[in-house]
Regions:
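Bacterial N-terminal signal peptides that target proteins for export
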Residues: 1-8
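Residue-level micro-sites within transmembrane alpha helices that shape
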Residues: 3, 19, 225, 245-246
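Bacterial N-terminal signal peptides
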Residues: 9-17
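Sec/Tat signal peptide C-region and signal peptidase I cleavage site
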Residues: 18-24
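Intrinsically disordered, low-complexity segments enriched in proline/serine/threonine
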Residues: 21, 220, 227-229
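Helix-boundary and membrane-interface capping/anchor signal
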Residues: 25-223
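A short, hydrophobic C-terminal helix/tail in secreted or cell-surface proteins
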Residues: 225-244
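C-terminal membrane-anchoring or membrane-association module
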Residues: 242-252
């Protein structure tokens, strides 16, 4: 068999064996959070929103501009774009950017966004969008997004529970850490986190998002190849193998 062809086949085989996941910068980690809040330190509210009137959709955001927090009813959608159904709660302790230093966060892998859904009788809710932004002064230096909507069949009743925890995936944690490594410890502590979110099937509320510090080592998630990637790799391997067989047959 031609050595070059063999190298291509081996390369495709290695690509097939390498885990590949769909883009998702923020991932839900069921190993953290819950009523006991295992693996989390103190939480600080960053965003509070509630579906207006008898509606079941809600959205809200907070970011940094001109040295102050900017609160809005606009929330990001994981499917793309934004929605502005509202309504964001603007109380001093309800919606505000939070500093990394205020949470004792020094590493990107320690950042946790905790979603506390307050639904009647612990009913279901769907988080339809979530974006975390890191601000250095007024400059947005880093964004991480939820890859797809996440539905929670049951929720914790009452406000103040630890809720559902989202953290950066390994690639995004490394990317943010690379930025943090360029700053002094004081500059890292001064960085602020902003948030944009949306939810559906929200009949109670208000829903809150907290910033927390991950004190436990995150569990490494096993990645599964995407169907499209798997099909492409298998097809390519079969095709190249057939081509190699044809060439080898002609030599006899």
């Amino acid at each position: 068999m031609n050595k070059r062809l063999l190298a291509i086949i081996l390369g495709l085989g290695m690509a097939l064996a390498t885990p590949h996941t769909a883009a998702a910068d923020l991932i839900f980690d069921a190993n953290l959070g819950g009523v006991a809040g295992s693996g989390l330190g103190t939480v600080f509210t960053i965003l509070t929103m509630q579906s207006p009137g008898s509606g079941t959709f809600e959205s809200g955001s907070v970011e940094r501009s001109s040295g102050a927090d900017v609160k809005s009813d606009t929330g990001v959608l994981a499917s793309g774009g934004t929605t502005n159904v509202g309504n964001v709660k603007t109380g001093a302790s309800q919606t505000l950017t939070r500093t990394l230093g205020g949470n004792g966060i020094t590493k990107a892998s320690q950042i946790a966004i905790v979603f506390n859904a307050d639904e009647p009788s612990g009913n279901s809710i769907a988080l339809t969008g979530l974006q975390m932004s890191v601000f250095n002064g007024d400059t947005d230096i880093f964004d991480a997004h939820l890859g797809a909507s996440v539905t929670f069949a049951t929720t914790f009743t009452g406000i103040g529970k630890e809720g559902f925890v989202f953290r950066l995936d390994s690639a995004e944690a490394a990317a943010l850490q690379a930025l943090l490594n360029l700053l002094t410890p004081a500059a890292v502590a001064a960085l602020r986190l902003g948030l944009s979110a949306s939810a559906s099937d929200a009949t109670g509320g208000p829903e809150t998002f907290n910033v927390a510090t991950i004190t436990a080592v995150p569990v490494t998630l096993t990645a599964t190849p995407e169907p499209g990637t798997l099909l492409f790799a298998v097809t390519a391997l079969v095709g190249l193998s057939f081509l190699a067989w044809r060439r080898q047959k002609k030599t006899f």
